[in-house]
Amino acid sequence: MRGRPAGWSPTGSRFGILQDARQGAGRDRRRHGGAREGGVTARYVATPQALAEVAGALRREPRLGVDTEAASFHRYRDRIYLVQVSGRTETALIDPLAIADLGPLGALLADPQIEKVFHDADYDLRVLDRDYGFRAARLFDTRIAAQLAGEAAIGLAAVVEKYVGVKLDKEHQKADWSRRPLPPPMLAYAAADTQHLLALRDALEQRLEGLGRLAWANEEFKQLESLRWTGAPAGGASDDESYLRLKGAKGLTPRSLAALRLLHRWRDSVAEREDKAPFRIIGNDALLGVSRALPASPAELGHVRELPPSLARRHGAALLDAVARAKQLPDAQLPRLERRPRPIKDPGFDGRLENLKAARNRIAVELGLDPGVLCGRSSLEAVARARPTNREALKQIPELRPWQIDVLGDAFLEAGSGP
């Protein structure tokens, strides 16, 4: 979620945003107009010297609000294009395209003396690990806190409006953060993502303390510290089996699957060459439609309902070539969806799982929590498989947190005691 303060105006404000006059390549800097929110100033950091200076100032803060901006909606290569870090009185908008060494930022994130506040930290932490190898210590996630507080709407805008009284908009939610220079409205918008996190954190902490759930949240926050990137390296191509995960692929014949595989590879190569998000080359529905129809001529291609005429004209030759090559493949080389064997369940598994789910749902209603927040399905299945008979056995189930055992333990032992 991306937001900016309501009522922001780029003219006549006292908010100073520093930006390199040459978009990060030169030495001279100039100030752009921006916004000032609640006494917090923000500046655009585009040189190693500026980063060292602002990191030194932020190192004196007890806690920092942190967020990142990417451009996966626009670019093939998913990477971080902006990092926002807010203290009590200053926000740094750090440009990783302009600064080769972000070591001072990594040191801030790793400092256990400084609490780092994110909203929905999972992806931010993973991409910070992927792009820079950064690890973050001592975390507070306002999204998790809102979930454990029983909030139904947990987006940043919703919880900031409820707990801080500031209305954020979504104007630049899908903006292209790879563009340079970033205009002042986008910079002010990005700054708002972190400028309200500290106040939101304090309000949610107070709420969780009142509910007796702060310890639950702290357990969840500690788990975040171990998050690492597990996908392809930054800028890496998608894996060769990713076409099988497209919605609708499982319903295709082997011959159509072969066409989809070749079409998907073609789209990926074009997207990489042009550094555009793959869907901006051609959408998934169009790929599936062509694969299903297996057209042999421009006329037949034009009858594919999912393919816009403009894309048929632009990419028709490449699409027909991929289909023709798929038709020429011998049957032995056609892809086939392998059915994964279903795990063998003992006869009483389904009954125990339903009993556990009913117990979980009952307690979730009593606590005013979403059942999935209280205990997810994978954790329920782990308990059903383990068939614990006491709390010590519950503690041996890695999917369960200690706070969940405290809250659900007795009910789980009773519900899972069947055959």
Regions found by a protein language model. Give the residues of each.
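Active-site-proximal helix-loop-helix substrate-binding element of RNase H-like nuclease domains
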Residues: Y44, Q84, R88-L198, D202-E205, ...
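Helix N-cap/beta->alpha junction signal
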Residues: T47, D120-A121, G283, G376
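N-terminal accessory regions of nucleic-acid-interacting proteins
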Residues: G16, R22, G26, R31-L64, ...
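Short beta-turn/strand-loop junction motif enriched in small, turn-promoting residues
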Residues: E69-F73, A145, E306-P308
